[in-house]
Amino acid sequence: GWRDWLKKGKEWIKAKGPGIVKAALKAAVQ
């Protein structure tokens, strides 16, 4: 479900760092 996806996303964010988070958000908006 989406909760599992969200949990994976949070773990991925912690691993990759805030720079990639900003890039992902920018891509999602477009």
Curated annotation (Swiss-Prot):
Alphabetized GO MF terms: toxin activity
Entry comment describing in which tissues the protein is expressed: Expressed by the venom gland.
Annotated localization: Secreted
One GO BP: defense response to fungus
Record's keyword terms, sorted: Antibiotic, Antimicrobial, Fungicide, Secreted, Toxin
Main location (coarse class): secreted
Record-linked InterPro entries: Poneritoxin (IPR010002)
This protein's GO CC annotations: extracellular region
Similarity annotation: Belongs to the ponericin-G family.
Function: Shows a broad spectrum of activity against both Gram-positive and Gram-negative bacteria. Also has antimicrobial activity against S.cerevisiae. Has insecticidal and non-hemolytic activity.
Protein name as annotated: U1-poneritoxin-Ni3b
